[in-house]
């Protein structure tokens, strides 16, 4: 590359781009396996010593990733020409990835006593160092003034979801999208996102009641404080007066498509809890077939995440202040129609949600906000891993409250019942969730003939801490016996 006829700045920029992608590659490997072989140069096909070496320490790999990201942050250019679409690599993309990575690594080291890929204690306590690196990256990006939250107060009931369904998000949301996948019909770069969201083979996505309970009321107070028996609040009532993002993330009463001409109720036949996602789902139902080519751009890193990364790192460092809150959590909540209230005590529901292991009021509120704002953006799994909350994956699923079995329900608010929960093997015009004897997976109601949907109770799910990293594939160890297996696998 250095032989190219270009200025030193341009050469450094493209080396930064290359090192950005190398860092991204190794971040994925680190988060999957922990310790992996690290290579800083290309390998000759005859160099068997390099090809068949063992795993480098997780801490070495982590440090090398940070080196690459620091180089990219320093040398990738921030010229406007690299930012005229949100799909190019530039300085701020590198800063955003550095912030995301350093938050992961800092909290991973804080909450995990041992390196999961060795089962042994970390050789050095570097959690604070990584959290401070996250703060520095966020501050540089935030202070640049290049990015902001997309917020039109008149459109707050729809604008959140529109970011994920816009035909030209890379252009329309350049102020918030730091990096995105730029789909294009003319170039044949498309995907069938609608089909994944509504097709009977794919559309089994569903949120749990435990998570939906974390959405605040519009007045900024917890839903779980307003209702003492919060799990028994009927569906229409629990969707009323909530954070605007709720109705832009799941099907709630009044949800329509096709320009408002068709009502779409939660389909319990497929989305078993009743909390069926709509984020990413386009308005035009004629595009729901698996052959439909859709080109809505998909954000990979948004400015909202940078604010959340900053808030979380500051909270974890014990440095959350009202000034930090007002720059991060407050604007996110106000954009969602929620009054911002600076916390004075920990919400008992959030303490319980995170297994009574976290009691810091700021950490808990940042986690609440992160879950709501970044839902379905591919970050939650790694969040649960780094927080050492793997037991959440084995927590029983809880769905919407059903007042009575065999009684047709109107879940979309058009006054016409369309949903039925029954233990009878029957064919009906309704969308049906079969329970008890009619349900092979063991779907039930929590109180027998009424109560919360309890999907797939016959499915046994257990958590073991060795699952914080994935197993090294057996075929890889067969090919290279110098590779060790992760503990427990």
PLM region descriptions:
Residues 1-192, 221-228, 233-489:
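Acidic/polar-rich alpha-helix caps and helix-coil junctions
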Residues 186-213, 377:
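Acidic-aromatic pocket-rim loops
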Residues 208-222, 241:
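Segments forming glycine/polar-rich beta-alpha architectures that bind adenosine-containing cofactors
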């Amino acid at each position: 590359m250095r032989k190219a006829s270009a200025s030193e700045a341009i050469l450094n920029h493209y080396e930064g781009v290359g090192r950005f992608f190398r860092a991204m590659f190794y971040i994925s490997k680190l988060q999957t396996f922990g310790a992996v072989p690290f290579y800083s140069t290309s390998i000759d096909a005859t160099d068997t010593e390099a090809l068949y070496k063992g795993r480098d320490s997780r801490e070495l790999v982590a440090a090398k990733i940070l080196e690459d990201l620091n180089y990219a942050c320093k040398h990738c250019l921030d010229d406007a020409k690299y930012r005229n679409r949100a799909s190019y690599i530039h300085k701020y993309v590198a800063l955003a990835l550095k912030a995301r990575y350093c938050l992961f690594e800092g909290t991973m080291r804080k909450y995990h006593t041992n390196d999961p890929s060795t089962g042994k204690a970390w050789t050095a306590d570097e959690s604070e160092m990584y959290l401070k690196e996250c703060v520095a990256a966020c501050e540089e990006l935030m202070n640049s003034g290049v990015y902001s939250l997309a917020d039109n107060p008149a459109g707050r009931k729809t604008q959140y979801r529109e970011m994920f369904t816009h035909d030209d998000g890379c252009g329309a949301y350049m102020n918030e999208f730091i990096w995105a996948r730029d789909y294009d019909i003319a170039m044949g770069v498309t995907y069938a996102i609608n089909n994944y969201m509504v097709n009977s083979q794919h559309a089994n996505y569903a949120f749990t009641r435990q998570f939906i309970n974390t959405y605040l009321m519009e007045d900024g107070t917890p839903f779980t404080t307003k209702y003492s028996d919060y799990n028994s609040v009927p569906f229409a009532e629990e969707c009323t007066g909530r954070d605007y993002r709720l109705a832009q993330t799941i099907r709630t009463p009044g949800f329509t498509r096709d320009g408002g001409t068709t009502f779409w109720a939660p389909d319990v036949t497929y989305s078993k809890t009743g909390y069926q996602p709509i984020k990413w789902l386009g308005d035009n139902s004629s595009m729901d077939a698996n052959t439909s080519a859709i080109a809505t751009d998909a954000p990979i890193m948004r400015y909202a995440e940078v604010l959340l990364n900053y808030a979380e790192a500051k909270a974890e460092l014990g440095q959350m202040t009202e000034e930090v809150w007002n720059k991060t959590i407050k604007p996110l909540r106000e954009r969602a129609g929620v009054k911002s209230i600076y916390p004075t005590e920990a919400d008992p529901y959030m303490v319980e949600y995170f297994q009574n292991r976290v009691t810091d009021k700021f950490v808990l509120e940042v986690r609440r906000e992160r879950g709501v704002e970044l839902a379905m953006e591919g970050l939650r799994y790694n969040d649960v891993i780094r927080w050492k909350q793997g037991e959440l994956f084995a927590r029983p699923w809880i769905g919407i409250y059903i007042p009575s079995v065999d009684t047709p329900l109107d879940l979309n608010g058009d006054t016409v019942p369309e949903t039925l929960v029954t233990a009878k093997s029957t064919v009906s015009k309704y969308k049906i969730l079969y329970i008890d004897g009619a349900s092979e997976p063991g779907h039930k109601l929590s109180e027998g003939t009424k109560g919360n949907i309890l999907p797939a109770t016959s499915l046994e799910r257990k958590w073991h801490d060795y699952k914080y990293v994935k197993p090294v594939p057996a075929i890889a160890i067969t090919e290279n016996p110098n590779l060790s297996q992760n503990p427990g696998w």
